[in-house]
Curated annotation (Swiss-Prot):
Pfam families: Ribosomal_L34. NCBIfam families: rpmH_bact (TIGR01030). The lineage of its organism: Bacteria, Pseudomonadati, Pseudomonadota, Betaproteobacteria, Burkholderiales. GO terms for cellular component: ribonucleoprotein complex; ribosome. Belongs to the bacterial ribosomal protein bL34 family. This is Large ribosomal subunit protein bL34. Keywords: Ribonucleoprotein, Ribosomal protein. GO terms for molecular function: structural constituent of ribosome. One of its GO terms (biological process) is translation.
Length: 44
């Protein structure tokens, strides 16, 4: 059986990228929470 994590930069960016987060209200909430926490990287 193959492993479940088969890395792909494209898929990573499309599902967890900054622009995707900015699209929805919930995504923007995630970014704001990470800003408030002081995360160095907000999104992938």
């Amino acid at each position: 059986m193959k492993r479940t994590y088969q890395p792909s930069v494209t898929r990573r960016k499309r599902t967890h990228g900054f622009r995707v987060r900015m699209k929805t209200r919930a995504g923007r909430a995630i970014l704001n929470a990470r800003r408030a926490k002081g995360r160095k990287r907000l999104a992938v």
